[in-house]
């Protein structure tokens, strides 16, 4: 632990990692209000799940989720949003444990075969994670890796009955 003196003249204790971050990237440590004495920071990038933009009239794309109970939910979304962001933004049961970094398989979806070929080929990282997914099918993909586009307007994806978080070795 190191002691530092803030701009306001307060003494604070910070870890060696925080001190290194402060020296190399001072913009990472920012004051959130003028009254707080803490300098919050995070070593992971901020993700904006749940903050979806409303599509402009005429630019809406549609996606239908087939839920675990068989019911269907259709949403109008913007181009460029990932299926993971859309699901989480509408409080659907999709964990996304890794935050969309393609490091787990908890956003596994089963794509309707009519739309599967319109998707870009999965990258090696996605294929590696899909190999660990519970209930893998020929049209399985990771929701964090599929961005909405006009090519897949109207896509239908099913949420599998279970997902497996390989990082925690548990089931949800």
Swiss-Prot record:
Note the Pfam families from the entry: Fer2 (PF00111)
Please list the cofactors this protein needs.
Answer: [2Fe-2S] cluster
Spell out the Gene3D superfamilies in the cross-references: 3.10.20.30
What is the transit peptide's residue range?
1-16
Gene Ontology molecular function: 2 iron, 2 sulfur cluster binding; electron transfer activity; iron-sulfur cluster binding; metal ion binding; oxidoreductase activity, acting on NAD(P)H, heme protein as acceptor
Query: What's noted on cofactor binding?
Result: Binds 1 [2Fe-2S] cluster.
Q: Name one GO biological process term.
A: iron-sulfur cluster assembly
Predominant cellular place of this UniProt entry's protein: mitochondrion
Subunit structure, interactors included: Interacts in its reduced state with the apo form of ISU1.
What does this protein do, in the record's words?
Iron-sulfur protein that transfers electrons in a wide variety of metabolic reactions. Involved in heme A biosynthesis and in iron-sulfur cluster assembly. Transfers electrons from adrenodoxin reductase ARH1 to heme A synthase COX15, a heme protein that catalyzes the conversion of heme O to heme A. Required for the de novo synthesis of Fe-S clusters on iron sulfur cluster assembly protein ISU1. Interact in its reduced state with ISU1 to productively deliver electrons for Fe-S cluster synthesis. Essential for coenzyme Q biosynthesis.
The remark listed among the other comments is: Present with 14800 molecules/cell in log phase SD medium.
Record's protein name: Adrenodoxin homolog, mitochondrial
Q: Which organism is it from?
A: Saccharomyces cerevisiae (strain ATCC 204508 / S288c)
Q: Please name the taxonomic classification of the source.
A: Eukaryota, Fungi, Dikarya, Ascomycota, Saccharomycotina
């Amino acid at each position: 632990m190191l002691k530092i003196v803030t701009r306001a003249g307060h003494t604070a204790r910070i870890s060696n990692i925080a001190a290194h971050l402060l020296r190399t990237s001072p913009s990472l440590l920012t004051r959130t209000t003028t009254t707080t004495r803490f300098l919050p920071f995070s070593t992971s990038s901020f993700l904006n799940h749940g903050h979806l933009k409303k599509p402009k009239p005429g630019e809406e794309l549609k996606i239908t989720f087939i839920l675990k109970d068989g019911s269907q939910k259709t949403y109008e979304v913007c181009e460029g949003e990932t299926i993971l962001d859309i699901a989480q933004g509408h409080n659907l049961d999709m964990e996304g444990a890794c935050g969309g970094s393609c490091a787990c398989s908890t956003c596994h979806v089963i794509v309707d075969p009519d739309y599967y070929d319109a998707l870009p080929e999965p990258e090696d990282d996605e294929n590696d994670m899909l190999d660990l997914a519970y209930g893998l099918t020929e049209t399985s993909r990771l929701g964090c890796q599929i961005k909405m586009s006009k090519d897949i307007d109207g896509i239908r994806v099913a949420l599998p009955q279970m997902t497996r978080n390989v990082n925690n070795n548990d089931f949800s």
